[in-house]
Amino acid sequence: MSLSLEQSPTTGDEVITNYTINFGPQHPAAHGVLRMVMELDGEIIERIDPHVGLLHRGTEKLIEHKTYLQALPYFDRLDYCSPLGMEHSYVLAVEKLLNIEVPLRAQYLRVLFAELTRICNHMLNLGSHVMDVGAMTPNLWLFEIREDCLNFFERASGARMHSAWFRPGGVHQDVPLKLLTDMADWIDERLHPLFDDAMSLVVDNRIFKQRNVDIAVVSKEDALRWGFSGPMIRGSGIPWDLRKSQPYDVYDRMEFDIPVGTSGDCYDRFMVRVEEVRQSARIMKQCIEQMPDGPVASTDRKVVPPKRAEMKQSMEALIHHFKLYTEGFHVPAGEVYVATESPKGEFGVYLVSDGSNKPYRCKIRPTAFSHLQAMDFMCKGHMLPDATAILGAIDVVFGECDR
């Protein structure tokens, strides 16, 4: 006997309508100040409308009123989970306009710390993603690795998070003597064992797989249409990585693989990041082994300030130092777009110079913005708890998204 269902769920005078609920902006799984207006049919998501901009601070406008050097710390405060990844795009853009050479040691140090930043970022994302779907222990272990990363940042630059260490022309200061050997030992003796232990708890865990496998499947075509980048597009099976396709600094000297997913679901995105951590460690080892001697900043005195020791002996050095930290250097008129492979995807800086000491315009291309626009597409037809897993797999930080 077949049951016949009425086309309309309306009975008598009662009209059954969909729920409309707010997810965030104070939700712990929103990873910041995301507000999503959800339309639910029972517990199934019919529609999602993400509301962004709650952390908008007018960064692009503020940069227009600062010198090129004063604008640098604003980038640390965009994606504050991977600050050096943000600085990297900006300093490369300024260097391209200035047309200056960066010493080889500075390039190696930049790549070394860009990859350490990637590991640091992925520890936070993988740990919080696992916690969002209900597991507690791996997050605590991954935060131990993240703490080690922050200690390395502090030893190199003096600050744990907002380093402002990358500078136009190189890096601000050389690393302490023992730091590179400590990093090499840390990769072998602490990073790999601790990370492998933490991942052994989740990658084959039945509950974790049920929460992530076949959730928010995005095909190659859809990933390209939505403008995905980083682990989001690689999770869909497209080996697109700016470190390989458009290498900058010394990435063309590094040997590493690009991990890609097979089915384009949340589990694949998670596993892409897991493998990226191992590849980043591989790049770091190569940087430490190949690290050359030499200066860590350009010798162009019209851009890079002189060292303290030089200022104590030379009047010209003192004048240059004073001018560079008050007026700043002038950048030739022109425009440039530079994108780097930040831990979350393609982070781009479009810089326009009018020949003065301040940027005429600095457009920031965030990674999470194009990923969030696909939330409705990815969540449709899934259950309400799946939205947290989907959001966790995107890896979004609102300092960068809202700018």
Swiss-Prot record:
Question: What GO cellular-component annotations does this UniProt entry give?
Answer: plasma membrane
UniProt EC number? 7.1.1.-
Keywords associated with the record: Cell inner membrane, Cell membrane, Membrane, NAD, Quinone, Translocase, Transport, Ubiquinone
UniProt enzyme class: translocase
Tell me, what is one Gene Ontology molecular-function annotation carried by this entry?
NAD binding
Instruction: Tell me the function of this protein.
Output: NDH-1 shuttles electrons from NADH, via FMN and iron-sulfur (Fe-S) centers, to quinones in the respiratory chain. The immediate electron acceptor for the enzyme in this species is believed to be ubiquinone. Couples the redox reaction to proton translocation (for every two electrons transferred, four hydrogen ions are translocated across the cytoplasmic membrane), and thus conserves the redox energy in a proton gradient.
How this chain assembles, per its entry, is:
NDH-1 is composed of 14 different subunits. Subunits NuoB, C, D, E, F, and G constitute the peripheral sector of the complex.
Tell me the HAMAP family matching this sequence: NDH1_NuoD
- Name this polypeptide is given: NADH-quinone oxidoreductase subunit D
